[in-house]
């Protein structure tokens, strides 16, 4: 490589930090799509599209899948049994619910805000971790080799017990055959706080994670 090529390469390199500050995911997701795929992706699946907030203002062509027809997704279906042929996507995006149930406050629509279409019961530890393996198997199937899976995941405290959702997700991905390649910590402006809370036993969550998996034995 010539000196000119080396200089040009160094000028093109833009550092991508592991901590992201901001409320919106759309800009961060655009950075992920520009940074991790081997080539500019054209076949993208959002497997938990909900109202499509990740893609507002984007020019990318994205197929949205959701189990709830009220969100009017392009494809209505279960991401644990996807209606797609194997190896047809370059990127899959996944944002599972992390809050186990609506609670008593019915003034807020948790389905729209958090994708909460179903409850998680005591049998499952008030967690959705039991849904990760089936999704991971399907994501692995529909991704092409070297394809990338972007997962947004938040840990949760329920009944004074910390639920390590991001660790459960990583384990599920690795058992399926994915390589967990990177992690972005997304920090919000402030924690979610209920004015009725009087006593705290854990710190309040001000962050979530974007975990990057690749359908490969290597990351680079």
Q: What residue ranges belong to the model's regions?
A:
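Class I S-adenosyl-L-methionine-dependent methyltransferase catalytic core
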Residues: 1-220
């Amino acid at each position: 490589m010539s000196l000119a090529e080396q200089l040009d390469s160094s000028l093109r390199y833009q550092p991508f930090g592991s901590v992201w500050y901001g409320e919106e995911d759309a800009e961060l997701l655009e950075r992920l799509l520009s940074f991790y795929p081997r080539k500019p992706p054209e076949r993208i699946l959002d497997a938990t599209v909900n109202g499509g907030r990740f893609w507002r203002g984007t020019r990318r062509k994205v197929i949205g899948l959701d189990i709830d027809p009220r969100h009017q997704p392009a494809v209505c279906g279960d991401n644990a049994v996807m209606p797609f042929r194997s190896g047809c996507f370059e990127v899959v995006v996944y944002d599972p619910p992390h809050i186990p149930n609506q609670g008593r406050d019915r003034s807020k629509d948790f389905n729209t805000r958090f994708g909460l279409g179903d409850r998680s019961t005591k049998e499952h530890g008030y967690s959705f971790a039991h849904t990760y393996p089936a999704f991971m198997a399907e994501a692995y199937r529909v991704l092409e080799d070297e394809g990338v899976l972007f997962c947004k995941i938040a840990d949760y405290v329920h009944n004074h017990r910390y639920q390590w959702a991001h660790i459960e997700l990583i384990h599920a991905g690795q058992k399926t055959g994915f390589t967990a390649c990177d992690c972005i910590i997304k920090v919000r402006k402030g924690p979610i706080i209920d004015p009725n809370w009087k006593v705290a036993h854990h710190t309040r969550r001000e962050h979530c994670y974007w975990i990057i998996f690749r359908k490969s034995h290597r990351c680079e």
